[in-house]
Amino acid sequence: MTTAVKPVSIQALVEGLRQLPEAAFGPTERVRRFLQETPVSAESLAPYLTWDRQHYTRNLIDRTPLYELMAICWEVGQASSVHNHRDQNCWMAVPIGRLQVENFHLVHQDLEGRRCRLEPSNTIEMNIANPCAVDPADPVHRVVNPREFNQRAVSLHVYSRPFDTCVVYSPEQGTCGEIQLHFNTEYGKPVGH
């Protein structure tokens, strides 16, 4: 019989992340297990959550040279572009709602020529009990809040090491390109673009 883990505040999660040794941010299992064993209470996230009907929002909670932690807010039906993580490790947890991660295998990429070929590989559902890690060997994916889930969702993302660009892909068009990443809020305060 498993015992339900009592949710902690986002501040307690940050303190726990800051105590993890640098080596923990290499293999994907250690941080994923930490997120599973340390669910975050929805109430403590309130200062970091912003919503936009047009696009999901990226809200920076904590950043060190080793990692960055953000909350991404998803309205019903919103999805990210298919993207990679620049050879960085990424772990995701969903303290509010549930989401799908659609993974892709990158068959070919010519970034200079802006061409690529992807094949869908698998889909994983994330919820409060099921955080996941992006496979560094096959890191191309998108996150989706399907209409049939019929609820807002919030995902917490831990990236090691922080990065400011990524490659986005259009599987349908066979194209790819680099984009600059930005935050809607940093440490609970709006960011001007």
Regions found by a protein language model. Name each.
Residues 1-40:
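N-terminal leader/capping segments at the start of a protein or of a new domain
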Residues 47, 51-76:
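A short glycine-rich, His/Asp/Glu-containing loop-to-beta-strand
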Residues 71-85, 136-138:
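Conserved short histidine dyad/triad with adjacent acidic residue
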Residues 76, 87-107:
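Glycine- and acidic-residue-biased ligand/ion/polar-headgroup-sensing regions
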Residues 91, 106-140, 181-184:
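Short acidic-glycine-tyrosine-enriched beta hairpin
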Residues 91-92, 149-165:
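A short hydrophobic beta-strand segment most commonly corresponding to one strand
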Residues 143-147:
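Asparagine-centered strand-capping/turn motif at beta-strand->loop junctions
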Residues 172-193:
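Long hydrophobic alpha-helical segments typical of transmembrane helices together
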